[in-house]
């Protein structure tokens, strides 16, 4: 049985491209907002890998040269400010925002924060909007670097919903060249929260169709 390995954000991008007809035209950037921050880019129907397969590591773009240290060896990496891990770290430092967050998973802590924000809790809302602004800074970088037709926000942080999308859109309007920013469509993922699972199926399907000899003896 063939085994195919793919990065989670790229698999998610392929799932968005194959299973959402609205995203099948133009170029697509799947902005994975999970325990880490990732990016998968599809242009002309093809996943972009770069020379050594390490392209589109948006989570390790430094947005603060004097910022928080990252395990990658850099400082100020985007995912230190808007990943589920980073949010949970902030909640653990301020446990009154989400009582009991210390015993929660990263996804549970984020869901609890977003629920409180949606219920009108001011402190939770401020933290959620701060995270959304950092997501927006990443979106600006994606637009400037790749000029995609679509940016799709997915995974744990995207569950913040419309308030997240509104703040990201506002940051993009403020920080991109108007003619470019307004022609980039930013949406929330319409696929299940963990689009990478759907993406794994998409990777298998694509390889089956493109390389049938991997699966069958066609000699």
Each model region followed by its residue ranges:
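ATP-binding/phosphotransfer module of carbohydrate and carboxylate kinases, centering on a glycine-rich
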Residues: 18-21, 25, 66, 74, ...
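General beta-strand structural signal in soluble alpha/beta enzymes
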Residues: 2-7, 41
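AAA+ ATPase active-site-proximal loops
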Residues: 10-11, 37, 153
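Short Cys/His-rich Zn2+-coordinating modules
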Residues: 13, 52-56, 187
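Glycine-rich phosphate-binding loop of actin/hexokinase-like ATP-binding domains
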Residues: 21-82
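Conserved phosphate-binding catalytic cores of ATP/NTP-utilizing and phosphoryl-transfer enzymes
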Residues: 7-28
């Amino acid at each position: 049985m063939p085994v195919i390995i793919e990065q989670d954000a790229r698999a998610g991008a392929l799932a968005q491209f194959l299973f959402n007809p609205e995203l099948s035209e133009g170029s697509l950037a799947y902005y994975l907002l999970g325990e880490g921050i990732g990016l998968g880019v599809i242009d002309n129907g093809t996943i972009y890998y770069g020379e050594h397969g390490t392209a589109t590591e948006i989570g390790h773009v430094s947005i603060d040269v004097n910022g928080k240290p990252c395990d990658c060896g850099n400082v100020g990496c985007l995912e230190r400010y808007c990943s589920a891990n980073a949010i949970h770290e902030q909640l653990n430092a301020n446990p009154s925002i989400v009582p009991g967050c210390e015993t929660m998973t990263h996804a549970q802590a984020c869901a609890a924060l977003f629920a409180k924000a949606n219920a009108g809790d001011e402190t939770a809302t401020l933290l959620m909007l701060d995270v959304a602004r950092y997501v927006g800074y990443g979106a600006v970088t994606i637009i400037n670097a790749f000029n995609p037709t679509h940016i799709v926000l997915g995974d744990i942080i995207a569950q913040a919903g419309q308030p997240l999308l509104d703040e990201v859109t506002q940051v993009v309007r403020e920080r991109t060249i108007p003619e470019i920013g307004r022609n980039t469509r930013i949406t929330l993922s319409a696929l299940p929260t963990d689009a990478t699972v759907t993406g794994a199926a998409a990777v298998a399907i694509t390889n089956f169709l493109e390389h049938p000899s991997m699966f069958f003896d066609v000699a």
